[in-house]
Amino acid sequence: MTILGIQLKALSRASLIHKKKVMVLDDWGPFDDGFEEASLTKGSEDEVQFWLAEELQKQNKVKILDSISLEELGRIIFQERQDVNKPSSLVKLPKDFYFKVSALIKDLKMRKDLESLEQLKKASQLINEIISIRTRKIIELAFLGITDQEILDRLTAEEILVYKNIKYIIEHSIGDIIGNTAN
């Protein structure tokens, strides 16, 4: 596994402990995870760690609220296409965008009806196009050596890792090719 792969895996695991907003569909708890005790009351909104929210959603105890929809993916792809060849035109995404996308795909795969299958196909197409456009823009940013924080703030945590790794490779490979390491 590459360093980037390890970094992305660590980021993915760390996101499991981030809190997510949920709508409580049925009373649940108390539950002590060693750090805090949680009890959820039907009809309320609460925040729980994502790994717990996912498990409780499978049991129909909660519904995760801060998820991403097909409509939102459509809006993002529309905006990304506006200036597809301009790397500084990256749309600002939530830092946990790819985590939300992963949760959407997981949720659609769990459902076994025809409509969900069609939504899964549509979501996959949108996500692949978003990734393709954004990756192209990120490579251009790294190649041009762009360090404008306003632009970099539009990247997700995963994209920041990709950007930094590509930038490092470009800077150091060019130096190696001509016989000295660039800084």
Language-model segments: which ranges?
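N-terminal, Lys/Arg-enriched amphipathic/low-complexity engagement segments
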Residues: 1-33
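Compact, well-ordered interaction domains used in eukaryotic information-processing assemblies
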Residues: 27-70
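Charge/polar-rich, low-complexity and marginally structured segments
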Residues: 2-12, 69-183
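Short N-terminal secondary-structure initiator segments
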Residues: 16-18, 42, 49, 86-89
